[in-house]
């Protein structure tokens, strides 16, 4: 097969699979990443803006300085918002909003921002956090593309669960083993985080943790391809100084290894300044199974397969992520995985409705609304179904209930929700 043909295939796959994603990762194991980047830059389908990361991009000021300099050579006005705000001592949400405003000036049409050679930069924790924040501020027409020989340490599994990101390995959509190929070994360890969080080794529940922190350290390390010690300390021990936090971290790590010593090698290894879960240990993780089901539901070509995938995702989501824990990093992830669960309920409701089973569709949507009462798109679908079933009084009652509930939460009824209600009542 010629390189041109391969380029056509990987480009077509990119267009197919990335259409609804904010972020695209060209997986490190792909052989034709550079071919695709060249094709994206040359394509007339959408405008692409390019920034090659370097060893200088170590923190937020350095990254923004380099990015605004290079992109201003492509679009002279780029960087005005960020430069006006400044790079240092600024809230990351404000800084990301300013960069997003600059990105929106690049093009009013769909466009790409390609961060190439991402592995060349020794990313500091502040830049890592900023990039995560930026994803939620990206303008609708701008898509972020990472090309790297190693996996950027973003929470890719959670991003995929929310439908914000996709991973591509050449022409293939990555649907499992998101971080590395699984070790060629039996699944001796099974990790369950959709619920209170527990670990099973060789069919037996592990209960020798010596506190909850070693167990949470394992769960935190599964979240990303790799983490720094400072990221761990910041997530777990914000009330301690650096030396105290490091000491407690090492004690916690030893307890984690002791609890799982029956597997042989240490489950958490240190490589090149980062900690990661040992790739020699094959772990069955319910979060991975859940996200795999979401991907299959999104990509399946027939309703039967879609239905089975959405149903599996719903069944896997027994309880919220690490239910009962209230650490900031946990509650943040909990909301993100809940987004995938609401999607599964809503999509299965759509299938039930298409199959002329509106009552079953309504029951699924009511479950979604109960799980997240603030998601107004679900409430709109419920009102549409009530109207379709000629349950006019319940349409009115539902709107009044959610209006009061949103008010009590300090939220407002969205104009689209109010407009739909008026249309349904007036019809």
Regions found by a protein language model. Name each.
Residues 1-7, 13-16, 161, 166-167, ...:
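Short boundary/linker motifs that mark transitions into or out of structured domains
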Residues 155-158, 167, 222-224, 241-245, ...:
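Intrinsically disordered, charged and Pro/Gly-enriched terminal/linker segments
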Residues 99-127, 147, 337:
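Conserved P-loop NTPase "ATPase switch" module shared by AAA+ and STAND
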Residues 23-52, 66-69:
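P-loop NTPase Walker A phosphate-binding motif
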Residues 185-187, 192, 251-281, 404-418:
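DNA-binding patch around the recognition helix
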Residues 22-23, 27-30, 120-126, 132-168:
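Sensor-1/coupling segment of RecA-like P-loop NTPase cores
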Residues 60-81, 97-101:
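Conserved NTP-binding/hydrolysis module of P-loop NTPases
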Residues 204-236, 256, 379-382:
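Short amphipathic alpha-helical recognition elements used for nucleic-acid or partner binding
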């Amino acid at each position: 097969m010629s390189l041109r043909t391969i380029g056509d295939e990987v480009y077509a796959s990119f267009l197919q699979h990335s259409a609804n994603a904010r972020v695209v990762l060209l997986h490190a194991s792909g052989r034709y990443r550079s071919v695709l980047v060249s094709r994206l830059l040359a394509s007339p389908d959408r405008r692409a803006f390019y920034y090659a990361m370097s060893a200088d991009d170590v923190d937020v000021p350095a990254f923004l300085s380099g990015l605004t300099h290079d992109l201003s050579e492509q679009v002279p006005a780029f960087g005005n918002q960020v430069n006006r705000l400044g790079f240092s001592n600024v809230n990351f949400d404000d800084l990301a909003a300013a960069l997003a405003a600059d990105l929106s000036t690049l093009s009013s049409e769909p466009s790409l921002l390609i961060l190439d050679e991402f592995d060349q930069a020794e990313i500091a924790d502040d830049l890592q956090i900023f990039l995560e924040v930026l994803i939620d501020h990206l303008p609708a027409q701008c898509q972020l593309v990472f090309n790297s020989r190693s996996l950027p340490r973003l929470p890719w599994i959670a991003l995929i669960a929310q439908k914000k990101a996709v991973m591509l390995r050449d022409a293939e959509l990555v649907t499992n083993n998101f971080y590395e190929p699984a070790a060629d070994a039996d699944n001796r360890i099974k990790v369950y985080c959709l619920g209170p969080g527990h670990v099973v080794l060789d069919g037996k529940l592990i209960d020798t943790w010596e506190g909850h922190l070693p167990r949470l350290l394992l769960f935190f390390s599964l979240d990303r391809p790799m983490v720094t010690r400072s990221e761990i300390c910041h997530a777990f021990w914000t009330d301690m100084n650096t030396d105290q936090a490091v000491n407690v971290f090492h004690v916690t790590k030893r307890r984690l290894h002791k609890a799982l010593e029956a597997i042989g090698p240490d489950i958490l290894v240190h490589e090149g300044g980062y900690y990661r879960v040992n790739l020699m240990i094959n772990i069955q993780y319910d979060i991975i199974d859940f996200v795999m089901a979401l991907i299959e539901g999104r990509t399946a070509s027939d309703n039967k397969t879609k239905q089975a995938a959405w149903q599996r995702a719903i069944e896997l989501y027994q309880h919220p992520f690490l239910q009962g824990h209230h650490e900031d990093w946990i509650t943040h992830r909990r909301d993100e995985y809940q987004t995938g669960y609401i999607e599964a309920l809503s999509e299965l409701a759509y299938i039930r409705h298409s199959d002329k089973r509106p009552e079953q569709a309504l029951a699924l949507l009511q479950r979604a609304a109960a799980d997240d009462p603030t998601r107004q798109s679900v409430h709109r679908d419920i009102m549409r179904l009530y109207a379709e079933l000629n349950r006019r009084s319940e349409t009115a009652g539902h709107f009044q209930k959610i209006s009061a509930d949103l008010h009590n939460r300090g939220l407002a009824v969205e104009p689209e929700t109010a407009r739909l209600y008026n249309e349904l009542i007036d019809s």
